[in-house]
Amino acid sequence: PEISFTANFGFKQPSAAPEWSDYVTSMKQYNRAQANDGNWGAMVPESTITAWENAYATGNYGPYNDVFPEVDWWKELVKNVGYEQAYNLNVRGGTKKMSYFVSLGYLHDGDIFNTTKQEDFDPSFSYRRYNWRSNFDFNITSTTKLSFNVAGKMGYQNQPSYYENVDSPDERFFKTFFTAPSNEFPIKYSNGIWGDGLSSDQNIACLMNEGGSRNIKQHQGFYDVILNQKLDFITKGLSLKASLSYTTSSSWTTQIMPGKILGKDDLVAQRTHIRINRVYDYANPIYNADGTITYNYTEKRYPDENAPGDLPVGGVYDGFKAYGRKLYYELALNYSRQFGDHDVSALFVFNRKMNESTNTANSGVMNFPAYEEDWVGRVTYNFKERYLAEFNGAYTGSEKFA
């Protein structure tokens, strides 16, 4: 047999990272815009700007700073590089009576986000795929050839289980990357509790790492049997081809939701984690005896003031997502022969298709199978390749017009 093996390694990285202005510049430009519109009451107090200027001057700021948080969400959550790898093994060989080809493949597309594996789930973005193909051709006799073909793939897509009960969760997730405030709260406060905005659900690090995980499993299978038979023993130039194809596809979703109550939608995973937001009174700094400066603050706690703490994983379940199968069979009778200056050919084809799938509105319900049937015929004639004639006919239908 002939054996070949290939391995490919690649890396990916963002072509460009967004750049942000510092908070002091943003506040000053904001005040200028408000002044132009005469919205004096909406302007940021000078005491706040001064406090932040001092924080920048002394380096007293950062993504985990309680009083002066500054988070570059892109820098904190996006890696410089992500990796992918692919392997493929091919084997071919055979004899005069039989030939074969077998191929096995594996692909792994790694994560470009900085996620942290949790005790009960892995929130990373990743994709794994296994694919296979095998072709077997048998020369049963000098006039009979039989082929078996099998192919398929199995894919596993993993991602955080964010925004479970909203439309377009992926779109909303990536939008949060650019809309999450940079200076309203730290990733985590010094007491270890996640930070969050005044409007809640704005800490994308908490959302991505603590919101659970979703694993989508997808399978596709393709199966073919083809028979080619020469019928010269009946009349020269006559042949028959019969084929049968069967295709299946299915997908499941395994979802882990911390605090999720099965059968209800009243708890979104990320909301089961304790988060706080602090608003500091920069206008009234407190000068301590040791030379440090502190500020009083008001604190808001999520999901509510009496929340006891993070809830354990409350929902782990396999959800049937979609299923489909297709059956196709065909019988073709072909005749081609030359009588001196006369060429005659004829073709008759019969095929039937069946398609069955789950209802898109309710994945637990199967649609009625759809059927299509075709009867096709063609006859051609030419004399010295100068005078040509062709006759075609077809009769088609489906269960919709029975």
Residue ranges of model-derived segments:
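Flexible, surface-exposed loop regions and adjacent strand-edge segments
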Residues: 20-26, 118-123, 163-177, 256-267, ...
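Outer-membrane beta-barrel proteins
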Residues: 14-18, 111-115, 145, 157-161, ...
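One-face residue pattern on beta-strands with alternating periodicity enriched for small/polar residues
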Residues: 6-10, 131-133, 222-224, 243, ...
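Membrane-proximal, glycine/serine-rich, low-complexity loop/turn segments characteristic
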Residues: 1-220, 226-232
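Short loop/turn motifs that connect adjacent beta-strands in outer-membrane beta-barrel proteins
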Residues: 1, 96-97, 112, 143, ...
